[in-house]
């Protein structure tokens, strides 16, 4: 039976960063991946990555075609498309990736650091011993089933969270998430007849008739290619994403006679982070821990950040002794301080968007109750103030939209409350339960006041 210091389940962006970070410090690391090596990196997503994530992680810009298109920001279209917010800031400068090449680039970095890879190998179940996760049972492409022992197992298996779902209840890790916190997505890569005029910005379209609780995206790729897709919240009786895509998006003139290059569907956990992401001998990263921006659904940057922070924490824990939940707890603190606070606050803003009508959003954007600067500050996790003048109040009262105005004010207030709550994230598991109970209270308040 092979023994490792760290066993990473999943060779995605989070898994490769966790493996690379741990292996660079001399730990014996193995990545288990169900895909063939050549297919690592292939994933259904928007393929966008902010440049600041590479900078923060100390990664140079890859030069082998991994960065397919530079973008300068995001344009958000109101449901009636009469108002467009252009969000252009250094933190919104980024790239549309060649997803497979980028995944291969990260895998190579993990391998060069010393990580081993078992591709075409399926995770079956975690191994337990005396309250610790101590490895995994896996099956390779020949059908052989065997066990791998490790001091720490990292669940980097994405939305399916194959390790998390099989953990025991005494680890205080949520094994399931609500459907209403997930977006069902459908995406295509298409070759247009000619290149779009706007190739500097990623475009986001709000329209509850097309994408209830979600949005449509059109992201420019190299030449006349685009990444186009949509997501709908899995709340109640939600529509099928592919059907919505072909009924509404493909009806646009710009897609007439376009060529389908690639298509696929997947799920995106758009909510706050899991309240706790560590247990004895186990750490959760990336989509497996619901580490995705709740507003735009981007998860590549947060996943890489979490992988790096998890790897760093695992190294420190093993240097000091056993990888207990307490020893690994610092990963929770690192992520919550760097991105989790913002993510949780944006989850409240997501509730506002889901609970608002298209008419409310049209008026709100047109009247500049929420401005481009507000959206930018919210996206960066900064405080912002609503531009609610007496004139705006009269307009909304006259159009019988004071309810939306009230919701907007409440949203800003609750985002601040959630931010302050995450600033007080416990520094050890002993103080976790009271914090978790308060989290649940805030979330339920948000749902009751903004969604219902």
Language model region names:
Residues 43-46, 93-96, 215, 289-301:
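Glycine-rich phosphate/pyrophosphate-binding beta-alpha loops
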Residues 1-14:
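Beta1/beta-strand and adjacent pyrophosphate-binding region of the FAD-binding site
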Residues 7, 23-43:
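Glycine-rich FAD pyrophosphate-binding loop
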Residues 123, 236-313, 318-319, 325-338, ...:
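FAD/FMN-dependent oxidoreductases across multiple families
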Residues 315-452:
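C-terminal helical "tail/cap" subdomain of flavin- and related membrane-associated enzymes
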Residues 109-255, 290:
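Predominantly flavin-linked oxidoreductase catalytic cores and closely associated redox partners
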Residues 89-108, 233-241:
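Short beta-strand to alpha-helix junction loop
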Residues 36-75:
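N-terminal FAD cofactor-binding segment of flavoenzymes
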């Amino acid at each position: 039976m092979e023994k490792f210091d760290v066993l990473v389940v999943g060779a995605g962006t989070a898994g490769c960063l966790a493996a690379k970070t741990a292996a660079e410090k001399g730990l014996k690391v193995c990545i288990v991946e169900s895909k063939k090596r050549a297919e690592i990196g292939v994933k259904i997503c928007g393929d966008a990555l902010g440049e600041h994530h590479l900078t923060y992680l100390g990664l140079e810009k890859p030069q082998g075609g991994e960065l397919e298109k530079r973008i300068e920001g995001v344009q958000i279209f109101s449901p009636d498309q009469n108002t467009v917010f252009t969000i252009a800031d250094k933190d919104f400068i980024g790239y549309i990736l060649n997803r497979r090449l980028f995944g291969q680039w990260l895998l190579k970095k993990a391998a060069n650091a010393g990580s081993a890879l078992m591709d075409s190998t399926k995770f079956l179940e975690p191994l337990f011993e005396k309250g610790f996760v101590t490895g995994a049972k896996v099956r390779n492409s020949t059908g052989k089933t065997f066990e791998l022992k490790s001091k720490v197992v990292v669940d980097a298996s994405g939305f399916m969270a194959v390790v998390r779902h099989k953990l025991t209840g005494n680890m205080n890790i949520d094994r399931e998430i609500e459907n209403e916190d997930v977006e069902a997505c459908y995406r295509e890569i298409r070759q247009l007849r000619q290149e779009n005029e706007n190739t500097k910005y990623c475009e986001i379209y709000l329209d509850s008739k097309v994408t209830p609780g979600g949005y449509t995206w059109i992201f420019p790729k190299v030449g006349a290619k685009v990444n186009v897709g949509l997501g709908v919240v899995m709340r109640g009786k939600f529509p099928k994403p592919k059907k919505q895509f072909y009924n509404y998006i493909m009806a646009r003139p710009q897609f007439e006679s376009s060529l389908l290059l690639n298509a696929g569907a997947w799920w995106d956990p758009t909510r706050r982070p899991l309240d706790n992401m560590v247990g004895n001998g186990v750490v959760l990263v990336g989509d497996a821990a619901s580490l995705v921006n709740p507003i735009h659904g981007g998860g590549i940057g947060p996943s890489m950040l979490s992988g790096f922070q998890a790897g760093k924490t695992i190294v420190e824990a093993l240097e000091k002794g056993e990888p207990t939940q307490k020893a690994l707890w610092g990963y929770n603190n690192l992520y919550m301080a760097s991105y989790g606070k913002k993510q949780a606050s944006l989850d409240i803003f997501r509730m506002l968007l889901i609970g608002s009508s298209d008419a409310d959003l049209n008026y709100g954007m047109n009247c500049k109750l929420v401005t481009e600067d507000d959206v930018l500050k919210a996206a960066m996790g900064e405080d912002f103030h609503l531009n609610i003048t007496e004139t705006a109040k009269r307009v909304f009262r006259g159009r019988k939209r004071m309810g939306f105005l009230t919701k907007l004010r409440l949203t800003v207030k609750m985002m601040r409350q959630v931010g302050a709550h995450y600033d007080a994230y416990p520094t050890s598991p002993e103080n976790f339960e009271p914090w978790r109970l308060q989290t649940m209270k805030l979330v339920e308040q948000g749902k009751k006041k903004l969604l219902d």
